[in-house]
């Protein structure tokens, strides 16, 4: 009788490891366009700088590749069964950071933040309590785009103070919430946010929009401690001498 070959975990490594970080897939997330799978954190961070799949190089989505991501819960369960102790290790790490991260940052009582995290439904996870004040900053002009005769023009007005400064990690979704709050819009009311006439996805960060959509380039980032004619090479808080202009309007349903 032929003996069955015993399979080792390393035999399955090509199927359960992330192409980006080379570790075991954590919250495996699949790109629906090409069906390549990566760690959720790895692929979300990759899409902040690129619209292409890191493995095959194909464009995932022209403007918002995060819409093409799906969590693979079945693969996650398979990995937990193949790799002894992985589930328990992740649970211990999660508990550790829940207990220690707020105390380390001194932010036990702070409210929700603007850090983008895609969950199973694609909404933003706002459990993190860091305001990102130490992040590079960007200046933005929020301009009301008025279309004559468009439904909703009477509801959406221009802001009294339309210039803001925020973290480069702020997402379009957070900007929409800010506008809804300032304009006192109903919770069901939806807005479009545009840059150079192109509608931006809710998970786009300000840094991503600046680098890929705004016509001005990195030379307009200035250090707060330098003169307007200097470009500072130091790391630290930055601002844009010519604010990036984002326009907003009532959402248009093209369906």
UniProtKB/Swiss-Prot annotation:
Main location group: nucleus
Source species, domain of life: Eukaryota
Compartmental location: Nucleus; Nucleus, Nucleoplasm
Record GO cellular component, one term: nucleoplasm
Encoding gene, per UniProt annotation: PCGF5
Molecular function GO labels: histone H2AK119 ubiquitin ligase activity; zinc ion binding
CDD domains assigned to the protein according to its UniProt record, in alphabetical order: RAWUL_PCGF5 (cd17084), RING-HC_PCGF5 (cd16737)
A Pfam family the protein falls into: zf-C3HC4_2
Biased composition (Basic and acidic residues): 109-119
Segments for region (Disordered): 97-132
Alphabetic keyword roster: Metal-binding, Nucleus, Repressor, Transcription, Transcription regulation, Zinc, Zinc-finger
Protein name: Polycomb group RING finger protein 5
SUPFAM superfamilies membership: RING/U-box
Quaternary context: Component of a PRC1-like complex that contains PCGF5, RNF2 and UBE2D3. Interacts with RNF2; the interaction is direct. Interacts with CBX6, CBX7 and CBX8. Interacts with AUTS2; the interaction is direct. Identified in a complex that contains AUTS2, PCGF5, CSNK2B and RNF2.
UniProt keyword Zinc present: yes
InterPro entries, per the entry: PcG_RING_finger, RAWUL, Znf_RING, Znf_RING/FYVE/PHD, Znf_RING_CS
GO biological process, one term: regulation of transcription by RNA polymerase II
Role summary: Component of a Polycomb group (PcG) multiprotein PRC1-like complex, a complex class required to maintain the transcriptionally repressive state of many genes, including Hox genes, throughout development. PcG PRC1 complex acts via chromatin remodeling and modification of histones; it mediates monoubiquitination of histone H2A 'Lys-119', rendering chromatin heritably changed in its expressibility. Within the PRC1-like complex, regulates RNF2 ubiquitin ligase activity.
């Amino acid at each position: 009788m032929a003996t069955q070959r015993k399979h080792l975990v390393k035999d399955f490594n090509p199927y359960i490891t992330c192409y980006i970080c080379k570790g075991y897939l954590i919250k495996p997330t699949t790109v629906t366009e090409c069906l390549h799978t990566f760690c959720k954190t790895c692929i979300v961070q990759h899409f902040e700088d690129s619209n292409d799949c890191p493995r095959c190089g194909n464009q995932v989505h022209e403007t918002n590749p995060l819409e093409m991501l799906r969590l693979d819960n079945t693969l996650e369960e398979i990995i937990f069964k193949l790799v002894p102790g992985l589930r328990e290790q992740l649970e211990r790490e999660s508990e550790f950071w829940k207990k220690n991260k707020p105390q380390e940052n001194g932010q036990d009582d702070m409210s929700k933040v603007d850090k983008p995290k895609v969950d199973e439904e694609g909404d933003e996870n706002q459990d993190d309590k860091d305001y990102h004040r130490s992040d590079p900053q960007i200046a933005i002009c929020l301009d009301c785009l008025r279309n004559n005769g468009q439904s909703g023009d009477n509801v959406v007005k221009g802001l009294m103070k339309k210039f803001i400064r925020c973290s480069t990690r702020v997402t379009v979704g957070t900007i929409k919430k800010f506008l809804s709050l300032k304009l006192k819009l109903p919770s069901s009311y939806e807005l479009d946010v545009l840059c150079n006439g192109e509608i931006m996805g809710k998970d786009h960060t300000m840094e991503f929009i600046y680098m890929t959509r705004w016509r001005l380039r990195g030379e307009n980032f200035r250090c707060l401690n330098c003169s307007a004619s200097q470009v500072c090479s130091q790391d630290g808080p930055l601002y844009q001498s010519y604010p990036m202009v984002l326009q907003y309007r009532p959402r248009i349903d093209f369906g």
